[in-house]
């Protein structure tokens, strides 16, 4: 019997608002323990929460980026449960009246076609405090850090439309790109600003029944999400074939052993309306204003880059997935003749270099204007590719323009035909065997001869001109 998986995701995204959700404390969970606290986020009696307008705006922009229908009225509830990181005994969330419903994202399916995956709802939620485990003497103690308490979150709940680990991974990549474009969050799973839990069940292929699901947590990268889902699918299939009952519970992903392990029985506490936070009312006028502020989104940019710049699908994805990369690319393209050359240098040279140096595109000294200057030198045949790579490395160390670096280091390409003819005459005389091999039809011999010309010219010869001269 063949099986198929039924997968849904619950994704928590920490909004990059400057303050927490219900108070003016800085939204910086990584600061010194308990530095950013007040009576509201410490949940002291008598302290009343007030929803931040900036947080609401970031949340709505996130909903719009995910094609969700923002509700005219949403409301907060108290999600009741007891845990040391939640001393007040409830978490402010939106259960009965979420901020938005009926969103969707289109992702690339396993067969290369586009697949629409639905989002059931998006709701706002305050984050809880963080437990810090330390050793004091011979005992382990747990302390509570309230810096994270009250940090603004949105929870994105999908429909169970995914059928494979790759569906889930592509959904997360697309969501991350969309939300970053909208400016709502940085969505870094590695840094904890995006967390994803997966609900997984299996059924016979072709069936439409929804069987008992298992929740999997503790996945801190998109790759781990895919690995955890694949393992859980295989585990449930083994249980099914052994005629064991699959029970509703939560499991943790162990990235070292690459297995899921039982955590607890699945528990959902009661949710009751919160009396302290007024209903969130959103006007059509404000919604239209925010919609107009959305930038061109990744999918739109991807299609335009293919049509306008004649990039391949893969090149267009690389240049459009991140907003900063897309804007950098278009800034370079505005100054050069070949968009494909710009895309190739950004993907093959610039992005790996700044990653190795721990820089961002905003921080790198290789500005769009400087990279464009380098590419113009290649396009005009003033330098060859090897020299261009040398100049590129020097752009990180020098404030000089690419043209000045070329002059300072004597890297300008030899284009004088008399100089090149002298080199070609010499290498033909010095390499009679390679010349005869070429005349006998051994095409790789021409590559050897061009290489020898580059050696004789100390890398400054124009390889295209040298090749033409040898052939002629």
Question: Model regions: which residues?
Answer:
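Extended, non-catalytic structural segments that build the interaction scaffolds
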Residues: 286-293, 330-335, 371-383
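Core structural elements
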Residues: 191-204, 269-272, 306-330, 339-357, ...
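DNA-binding alpha-helical recognition surfaces that contact promoter or target DNA
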Residues: 390, 464, 468, 472
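Short, basic interhelical loop/turn and adjoining N-cap
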Residues: 457-463
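Strongly charged, low-complexity linkers/loops
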Residues: 362-372, 385-456
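Amphipathic alpha-helical core segments of compact helical bundles
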Residues: 16, 234, 326, 347-355, ...
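Basic, nucleic-acid-interacting segments
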Residues: 1-296, 313, 334-338
């Amino acid at each position: 019997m063949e099986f198929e998986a039924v997968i849904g995701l619950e994704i928590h995204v920490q909004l990059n608002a400057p303050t927490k959700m219900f108070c003016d404390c800085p939204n910086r969970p990584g600061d010194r323990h308990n530095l950013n606290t007040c009576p509201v986020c410490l949940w002291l009696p008598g302290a009343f929460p007030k929803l931040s307008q900036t947080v609401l705006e970031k949340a709505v922009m996130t909903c719009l980026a995910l094609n969700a229908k923002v509700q005219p009225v949403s409301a907060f509830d108290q999600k009741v449960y007891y845990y040391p990181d939640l001393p007040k005994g409830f978490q402010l969330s939106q259960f009965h009246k979420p901020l938005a419903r009926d969103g969707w994202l289109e992702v690339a399916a396993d067969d290369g076609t586009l697949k629409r995956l639905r989002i059931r709802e998006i709701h706002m939620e305050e984050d809880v405090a963080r437990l810090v485990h330390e050793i004091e003497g011979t005992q382990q103690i747990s302390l509570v850090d309230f810096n994270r308490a009250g940090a603004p979150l949105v929870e994105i709940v999908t429909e169970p439309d995914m059928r494979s680990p790759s569906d889930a991974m592509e959904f997360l990549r697309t969501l991350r790109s969309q939300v970053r474009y909208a400016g709502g969050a940085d969505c870094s799973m590695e840094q904890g600003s995006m967390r994803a839990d997966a609900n997984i069940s299996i059924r016979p292929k072709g069936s439409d029944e929804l069987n008992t699901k298992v929740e999997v947590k503790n996945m801190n990268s998109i790759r781990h999400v895919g690995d955890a889902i694949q393992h859980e699918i295989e585990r449930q299939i083994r249980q099914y074939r052994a005629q064991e009952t699959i029970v509703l519970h939560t499991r943790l992903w162990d990235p070292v052993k690459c297995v899921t392990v039982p955590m607890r029985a699945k528990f959902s506490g009661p949710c009751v309306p919160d009396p302290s936070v007024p209903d969130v009312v959103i006007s059509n006028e404000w919604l239209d204003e925010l919609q107009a502020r959305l930038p061109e989104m990744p999918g739109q940019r991807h299609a335009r880059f293919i049509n306008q710049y004649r990039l391949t699908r893969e090149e267009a994805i690389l240049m459009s997935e991140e907003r900063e990369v897309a804007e950098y690319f278009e800034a370079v393209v505005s100054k050069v003749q070949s968009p494909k050359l710009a895309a190739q240098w950004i993907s093959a040279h610039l992005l790996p270099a700044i990653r190795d140096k721990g820089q961002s595109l905003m921080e790198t000294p290789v500005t769009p204007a400087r990279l464009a200057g380098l590419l113009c030198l290649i396009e005009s045949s003033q330098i060859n590719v090897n020299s261009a790579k040398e100049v590129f490395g020097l752009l990180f160390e020098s404030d000089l323009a690419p043209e000045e670096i070329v002059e300072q280091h004597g890297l300008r390409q030899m284009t004088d035909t008399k100089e090149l003819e002298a080199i070609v005459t010499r290498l033909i005389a010095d390499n009679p065997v390679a010349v005869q091999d070429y005349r006998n039809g051994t095409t790789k011999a021409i590559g050897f001869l061009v290489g020898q010309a580059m050696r004789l010219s100390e890398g400054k010869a124009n390889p295209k001109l040298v090749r033409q001269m040898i052939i002629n």
